[in-house]
Amino acid sequence: MTHILTRRGFLSSAAALPWIAPVGHALAQTQTPPAPKTPPAPAEPAKPSTPPSPDVPYGVSPLGISDSLRDGSLYVPKSYRDTTPMPVVVMLHGYSGWGDEMKSTFQLAEEFGVVIVAPDSRDVTWGRSAPGFDEDVRFIGAAFRKAAQNLNLDPDRVALGGRSDGAGYALSMGLAYGDTFNHIISIAGGLMAPVRRKGMPKIFIAHGTTDQQMPIERTGRLFQQQLKDDGYDVTYREYEGGHATPVDVVREAFAWLTGKPFKPAP
């Protein structure tokens, strides 16, 4: 059976105590005096931080993998260095959207040190035909491969995420391709219809308690319980409000992905 994602809506990281031997006067007369201490070696000058790589497209740039108007964006934070693997999230937009709409997450990419791949859906939304084997999943694969070939990505923190229609597709495809994407982020998603299940990805689900487009009782609450029953590691967050997503919810998802402490925005 073909599942079609057509829901509207997209919002909006000792000093060691010196060892002191209590030496009394009598002991001092009968013990060999200790050898003088060796003076400490001079401190080495601080090494300069690794410089940026000249061939890395820092900031936002086009994916450059589609001949059509629908392509997508790649965001590389200024903290990226070729010598250090960095977490990555493929972030999917909502209904009738563009990858460029994920620019709302670029500040979080800088804050937490995450590469963002933001492709455009092939049509008005994701998965309009043969989910799992459609043009969308092939394009997502090509976008991810380009990032992996050109950047040093952390293989232990590879996420597929999204909001609204993108969240439903991310949850479905993340479960189907859990041997590639070991983390899934679903925010205000309305569908979970994997064509198969591979691997055991960790999952972050967040949903608004008064979401009228994708009611929580039939989506977030239901999905998280089913996934927990199936043995998945699920982090679940409910937030007050409707289909729009508070910035702190997305911030918590990035903290979860990177393993860094979560602090609400001031």
Where are these regions (language model features)?
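Alpha-helical scaffolding within the catalytic cores
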Residues: D100-T105, I187-V195, R221-L222
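Post-His helix in hydrolase/transferase enzymes
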Residues: V247-A255
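Acidic catalytic loop of the alpha/beta-hydrolase fold
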Residues: T210-P215
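Primarily recognizes the serine-hydrolase "nucleophile elbow" in alpha/beta-hydrolase
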Residues: D156-G199
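A domain-start/cap signature at the N-terminus of enzymes
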Residues: T2-I4, L11-S13, L17-P87, G132-E135, ...
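Short beta-strand/loop motif that positions the catalytic acidic residue
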Residues: I205-H207
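Histidine-bearing beta->alpha loop at or near hydrolase active sites
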Residues: Y239-T245
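Serine-hydrolase catalytic machinery in alpha/beta-hydrolase-like enzymes
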Residues: S49-S79, T83-L151
